[in-house]
């Protein structure tokens, strides 16, 4: 296992790019609880990042000079790049150029910015298990697997991760790439599959109708967003560098099982579902199951939240936020 950074877990000045997003907000919250100084960076502020220092920056267009200036002004020790072109605001309606601009272009500009900062700033870059591309069903996907992504999204994510790894291996940067499986848990991005499930069940509960859901035959690895945030913080506080690390549950679940588990974990009978089977558009491969041994050995990380707990908390967090106001 890699040793912690000198003084860790002391107070590190941690900038979270994409700090208002699904994963970013959980990283900000956990980093603050750990005693780190958090700087959330995003295009616009959101209420849930109010407890943290915030810097407004359009990362899709920010120059290396503006990023470097931000890092110097706030004396940042660690940058977490939690941005993703398939984000909560814009969804998946992106051109290939848009995907490349953020998933790769931002990484290149960020690496250039790190080179202008006098002190060594650590980088934890959030990639995706879908960078590996299509693999045969049953494959346990470890980091030795040669990536072969086929979609514009996954190719752009891989290119960003490879840029970070190349910089760390040449000594131009210090840090890790975390390749994260599909995510579940509280505050999902509206355009994500879990986010759409929450919206569909919310509508069904409000109207008394059945919950229509279109399902493909994919089997995916789902990991709770809070467990991912824990992995990110372990990477922040580690000295390990120059490696990709898979972050997942280590289990593949088929989509019908996932949906039924979500509904029953929320407290409703599976009969509420109106399931429709057909091919579903996806950003990644039809099978993912992460080998997470490197995360255990290098970072001392393992997932702690069951899928049922993750889906239950995802639903009840949403219910608390959308509870009708009595008397109005």
Name each region found by the language model:
Residues 81, 108-150:
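Conserved Rossmann-fold NAD(P)-dependent oxidoreductase catalytic core, especially the SDR/UDP-sugar
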Residues 89-97, 134-138, 189:
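Conserved catalytic-core motifs of eukaryotic protein kinase domains, centered on the activation segment
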Residues 14-34:
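N-terminal Rossmann NAD(P)H-binding glycine-rich loop of SDR-like oxidoreductase domains
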Residues 59-102:
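NAD(P)H-binding glycine-rich loop region in Rossmannoid oxidoreductase-like domains
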Residues 156:
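Active-site helix of classical SDR
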Residues 41-45:
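N-terminal Rossmann-fold cofactor-binding loop
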Residues 137, 165-220, 225, 261-262:
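NAD(P)-dependent short-chain dehydrogenase/reductase
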Residues 204-328:
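C-terminal substrate-binding subdomain of Rossmann-fold SDR/epimerase-dehydratase oxidoreductases
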């Amino acid at each position: 296992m890699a040793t912690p950074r000198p003084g860790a877990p002391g107070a590190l000045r941690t900038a979270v790019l994409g700090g208002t997003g699904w994963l970013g907000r959980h990283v900000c919250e956990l980093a603050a609880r750990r005693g780190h100084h958090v700087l959330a960076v995003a295009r616009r502020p959101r209420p849930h990042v109010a407890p943290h220092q915030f810097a407004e920056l359009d990362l899709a267009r920010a120059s290396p000079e503006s990023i470097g200036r931000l890092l110097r002004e706030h004396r940042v020790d660690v940058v977490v790049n939690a941005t993703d072109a398939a984000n909560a605001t814009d969804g998946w309606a992106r051109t290939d150029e848009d995907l490349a601009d953020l998933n790769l272009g931002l990484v290149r500009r960020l690496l250039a910015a790190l080179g202008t900062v006098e002190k060594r700033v650590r980088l934890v870059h959030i990639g995706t298990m879908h960078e590996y591309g299509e693999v045969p069903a049953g494959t346990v996907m470890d980091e030795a697997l040669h990536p072969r992504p086929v979609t514009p999204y996954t190719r752009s994510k891989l290119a960003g991760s490879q840029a970070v790894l190349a910089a760390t291996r040449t000594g131009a940067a210090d840090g890790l790439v975390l390749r994260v499986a599909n995510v579940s848990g509280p505050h999902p991005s509206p355009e994500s599959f879990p986010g759409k499930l929450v919206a569909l069940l919310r509508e069904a509960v409000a109207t008394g109708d059945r919950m229509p859901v279109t399902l493909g035959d994919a089997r995916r690895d789902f990991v709770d967003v809070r467990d991912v945030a824990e992995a990110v913080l372990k990477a922040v506080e580690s000295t390990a560098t120059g490696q990709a690390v898979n972050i997942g549950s280590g289990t593949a679940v088929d989509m019908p099982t996932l949906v039924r588990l979500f509904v029953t974990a929320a407290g409703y009978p599976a009969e509420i579902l109106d399931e429709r089977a057909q091919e579903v558009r996806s950003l990644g491969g039809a099978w993912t199951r992460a080998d997470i041994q490197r995360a255990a050995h290098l970072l001392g990380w393992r997932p702690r939240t069951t899928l049922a707990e993750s889906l239950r908390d995802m639903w009840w967090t949403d219910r608390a936020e959308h509870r009708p106001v009595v008397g109005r």
